[in-house]
Regions:
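N-terminal auxiliary interaction/assembly segments of multi-subunit proteins
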Residues: 1-182
């Protein structure tokens, strides 16, 4: 199923899947030396709230650090990258060359910054793929959410795709909400 036709290229479900898989894989491999594996994906277009992380995941009550970056232009949307808090701390240590003790002394703000930057890189790769397909757009600044067992709802007109990755035994979720041509 395609979102909308463009003079250049159609954005299909497969295109979205390939682009987010490439983005997550490239950023994790380059920045962290990890190679995440896509486990499954799910489509939702009805504007319902986010059940998968809560209802289907054994980590429903695990605290998460969630980075989000938007893109605006010929394609508009948001991408949320969910990391369990413990994995976000490991990623931060690896990304910044810190020990757990150093990170504990520096506090959660450092984890927030690292997850925000990682999310910005992932969404940047995804956005560049959209631009290469004829949908010029630019990024918004990263934001961070922290918590557990919460819901994010999409608007009724947005197409939503949710992708689950395994990265060294940790679940990473990419939640994409987007519209083309508005």
């Amino acid at each position: 199923m395609a979102l909308l036709m463009s003079p250049t290229e159609c954005v299909t479900e497969q295109t979205i899947r390939d682009n987010i898989t490439r983005a997550v894989s490239d950023v994790f491999a380059t920045m962290l030396g990890h190679h995440p594996r896509l486990l499954e994906d799910q489509m939702e277009t009805s504007g319902q709230s986010w059940p998968p992380l809560v209802a289907r995941n054994e980590l429903a009550h695990t605290p998460h650090v969630v980075g989000t970056v938007g893109f605006i232009g010929e394609a508009n949307g948001l991408i949320y990258i969910y990391l369990p808090d413990a994995f976000a701390r490991l990623v931060t240590c690896r990304l910044l060359g810190l020990t757990e003790t150093e990170l504990a002394n520096d506090g959660e703000a450092v984890v927030n910054d690292a997850v925000g930057e990682l999310t910005n890189m992932i969404v940047g790769v995804f956005k560049n793929c959209l631009c290469d397909s004829g949908y010029p757009c630019r990024l918004t600044i990263p934001s961070i959410l922290r918590g557990n067992n919460f819901h994010i709802e999409s608007t009724g007109s947005a197409v939503r795709r949710i992708y689950y990755f395994d990265c060294v035994g940790h679940r990473v979720v990419a939640d994409i909400m987007m519209k083309i041509g508005e």
